[in-house]
Amino acid sequence: MSNPSIFQNPKSGSIKVDGTFQVVDAEGKVIKTVTDPKLCGCGLSQDKPFCDKSHANYVSIVTRMLEDARANAKAVTPVGVWNMRAYEIRKRSLENRLAVGENLIGVKFGGALLKSDSVEKCYEGIFGFLTDAMQIETELNLGSLIAPLAEAEVVFKLAKDLDRSISLEEVFDFVSHIAPGIEVFDCRYGAIDPYIDDAIADNACAGAIAIGTWVEAKSHDLTASEISIFVNESLNQKVSTKAIAGNPWQAVVNASEKLANAGVVLPAGSIIFSGSATNGIAMQPGKYRVEITGVGEVSFEAK
């Protein structure tokens, strides 16, 4: 087709092309001649030369796909979620959880892989919602998860509503308590590092969480602490808490920015998981324990 005119609808993702072009097979044989086609940008009909209206139910379809993966503990293939719809899918998933009686208790912060031509992997911060149903008391059933990884983190409890982006100097005005935490990262796409839009749609791969005893935030120099993760009481990794964003308190600042951009307000008493200080540990049955010097520890049994 010569001199095509192309328009993409920013809301639906559909692409309107003015002109006539031919759809051919691998051998160059013409399958169909299409005039002024409307190409589907939703990602669900990539094998079709024209829009089949799939995008109308896109959010519901992908949300259900990810919810089924979680419920059945069976990985699904990433669909290459379109950016604007990723946020809608994350929100819809939370709404569905709340509709069945779960309660929102906070968010987890972490990094997601960006699409890039660079040899080195590039990541950007994202968040996922946490509900009370994700909290581990003493035991975790590994059979309910897909590709669980155990990560050592710091957990922050909010003293007041986090309703805007804050600075590092303001953190203690917003955080009342801290605790050691273990996040179980569980990607619904299996043991892969998903690209950012798929990761957002998957609620930042939130699986399960364990939280230790709360201590007052101002009474501990968190930047001078070390965080260790043990498997069956054998030390697996030990790092400075500065492995979290260069300063663990910065995790709250970063989270506040992402939440503000998304229009999300976390009420007082909510929690924020910092993002992992350690490399994720592929989980097998056994005891997992995280310790933060001067703060405390948390543990659970995986079966």
Question: Positions of the model-derived regions?
Answer:
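N-terminal pre-ligand scaffold of iron-sulfur
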Residues: 1-44, 48, 60
